[in-house]
């Protein structure tokens, strides 16, 4: 079985969505390591306001999915 990691990101400066090319791995451990690295990259990218990162298999099973977004400022009235 093959494992794939993909990230969908929203660039707040360009108001555009980007999807990374799925990266393929032979083991679930390799995919999980890449998943956490990608999520870390997304979280440190100042031009993004949200991203969704996921691991899925070649038979369509989703192993992990994580959504990250920039915290919204609190409005105090």
Placement of each model-derived feature along the sequence:
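Short aromatic-glycine-(Arg/Gly/Cys) micro-motifs in beta-strand/loop hairpins
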Residues: 1-21, 49
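A generic structural signal for ordered secondary structure
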Residues: 10, 21-26, 55-59
């Amino acid at each position: 079985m093959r494992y794939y990691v993909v990230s969908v990101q929203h660039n707040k400066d360009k108001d555009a969505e980007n999807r990374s090319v799925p990266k393929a791995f032979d083991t679930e451990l390799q995919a999980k390591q890449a998943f956490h690295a990608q999520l870390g990259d997304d979280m440190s990218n100042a031009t993004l306001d949200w991203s969704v990162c996921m691991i899925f298999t070649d038979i369509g099973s989703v192993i992990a999915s994580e959504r990250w977004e920039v915290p919204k400022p609190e409005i105090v009235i």
